[in-house]
Amino acid sequence: MKLGLLGGTFNPIHLAHLRIAEEAREAAGLDQVLFIPAADPPHKPLAGDVSFELRAAMVQRAIAANPAFRFSDIEAHRAGKSYTVDTLTALRTARPGDELHFIIGSDSFLELGLWHRYADIFPLASLIVLERPEKAITEPLQQLPELVRDQFVQEAGNLVRHSSGTSIRFVIGTRLDISSSQLRERVARQQSIRYLVPPEIESFITQKGLYQP
């Protein structure tokens, strides 16, 4: 199975998350996309005091109508920070027959050199990098961390190949300027988030009283 992996705090999940997953699925011919909420994100504190259970519930509601989208709570079962390399290692062990494709945005791709044990990520999974139309990455090899650059070769089109056989695929995505922080701020100011999140998520946030000042 070609399995896409989309991680994040999903605090809350919104329409841009869903569109990213759909465009990655279509571009790479993925069979499924696994949504993986971070239990303890390493790079920034979790805003809004919203538990893993509540964020997980929102993800499950948001993806329920799409049979290609699945939920994983794998990071809730591991102590410590939710490092990508640890999650990929666990998934590689649990699903040895699957072809893993980790989905990230172009901003995250350009910061890979700052990630925990980033060099160990590339043999574990291919990457699908969703680019903004106005910020397409040119010369992708030059944007890779210098310490691993010689492990990659440029192939035809939008593909870069790692020496282990995995790849990095660059996909121009639809521009949807929606962020979870923006949504939290709107809720706190009593402003509408309709058409920025699925209806089920808007209702859930209201029912649970999330993101109130």
Curated annotation (Swiss-Prot):
Pathway where this protein functions: Cofactor biosynthesis; NAD(+) biosynthesis; deamido-NAD(+) from nicotinate D-ribonucleotide: step 1/1
Catalytic activity as recorded in UniProt: nicotinate beta-D-ribonucleotide + ATP + H(+) = deamido-NAD(+) + diphosphate
Gene Ontology MF terms: ATP binding; nicotinate-nucleotide adenylyltransferase activity
Pfam families xref list: CTP_transf_like
E.C. code: 2.7.7.18
One Gene Ontology term from the biological process aspect of the record: NAD biosynthetic process
Annotated disulfide bonds: none
Matching InterPro entries: Cyt_trans-like, NadD/NMNAT, Rossmann-like_a/b/a_fold
Swiss-Prot/TrEMBL keywords: ATP-binding, NAD, Nucleotide-binding, Nucleotidyltransferase, Pyridine nucleotide biosynthesis, Transferase
Family: Belongs to the NadD family.
Functional note: Catalyzes the reversible adenylation of nicotinate mononucleotide (NaMN) to nicotinic acid adenine dinucleotide (NaAD).
Protein name as catalogued: Probable nicotinate-nucleotide adenylyltransferase
Species this protein is from: Trichlorobacter lovleyi (strain ATCC BAA-1151 / DSM 17278 / SZ)
